[in-house]
Amino acid sequence: MFRWAIIFAVIALLASLLGFGGVAGLSQNFAYIFLVVAVILFIIGFISRRT
């Protein structure tokens, strides 16, 4: 999940540098969603291993 978040963050950065505002915004949203999901899954996995 972190890998996908980084990939979409890089796509957003490149798209914004090239002037594609819509693509940059969409890629940024996907990167944020993947990052949040990855953090939530990490926390759930960490808690389930401790109990």
Curated annotation (Swiss-Prot):
- Keyword flag Secreted: no
Provide the transmembrane region boundaries: 6-26, 27-47
Q: Where does it localize?
A: Cell membrane
Q: Which residues form a coiled coil?
A: none
Kindly give the membrane topology term recorded for this protein.
Multi-pass membrane protein
InterPro entries associated with the record: DUF1328
Predominant place of localization: membrane
Give the Pfam families listed for this entry. Answer: DUF1328
CC per GO annotation: plasma membrane
Keyword list (alphabetical) reads: Cell membrane, Membrane, Transmembrane, Transmembrane helix
Protein family membership: Belongs to the UPF0391 family.
Task: Name the NCBIfam families for this protein.
Answer: PRK13682.1-2, PRK13682.1-4
What protein am I looking at? UPF0391 membrane protein PsycPRwf_2202
